[in-house]
Amino acid sequence: MNHLWLFIVTVSCIYLVYGQGEESVPCKVKFMGTACPLGRLVCEEDGDCLGVNQVCCYDGCGTTCHNKTTTLIPSTTQPQIQPIIPSTQPQIQPIIPSTQPQIQPFIPSTQPQIQRIIPSPELLCPVVTVRYAFCRFSTYTPCHTSNDCAVPGMKCCPDVCGKRCKFPINSTDHQQFQQTPLKPTVPLPQYQQTPLQPTVPSSQPPLQPTVPSPQSYNYKGACST
């Protein structure tokens, strides 16, 4: 019995000194943290293990058979920190939505644009010759500028009832249609009225009305007695 315990202590010292069975994979792990259970002596060498890929390892409490490719108990040692090797591949940056308004790219339109013809300043509006007219605003289309005219080439010109779109004329034609200025009217001669003279009473006696006499009447045709 004493030889058995001496053998166990000797094997334990060999594992501690030489790295637990020549640095085999399952023998790296030690059984630590709790009390050792009884009956941990299972093998003395790898040949005592029944498995093909098993080795006889010391786990901290005794010698047991373990597979070469598995570990008995998770290691309590700290994991090794691997050095960070900078990658040569470009890193994909995460897309962060921007709070600023995005500027839309300008895309030229394929549809033909309608060019509005604006009359040149040399073209003038025709002269308004009618001074008075009945304005029917139900059929009257006013304008403010030449851009309001729907027909190309027309110009917003003054009219009797306001402004409306008209075709302009050249400056030479405009002078021909200018209205001749009215001549100043000559005032009519004023006739002075003669004031009425007050009537003076006459010194002659007033005329008496004549009364016809009975003899002056014509009795022809009267009844005879």
Swiss-Prot record:
Biased composition (Pro residues): 203-212
A Pfam family: WAP
Tissue specificity remark: Component of the acid-soluble organic matrix of calcified layers of the shell (at protein level).
Keywords: Disulfide bond, Glycoprotein, Repeat, Secreted, Signal
InterPro entries documented for this protein: WAP_dom
GO CC entries: extracellular region
S-S bonds: 27-57, 36-61, 43-56, 49-65, 125-157, 135-161, 143-156, 149-165
Comp. bias regions, Polar residues: 213-225
UniProt biased composition (Low complexity): 188-201
Major localization listed first in the record, in broad terms: secreted
Signal peptide: 1-19
Domain spans labelled WAP: 27-68, 117-169
Residues with attached carbohydrate: 67, 170
Protein's name according to its UniProt entry: Perlwapin-like protein
Annotated organism of origin: Lottia gigantea (Giant owl limpet)
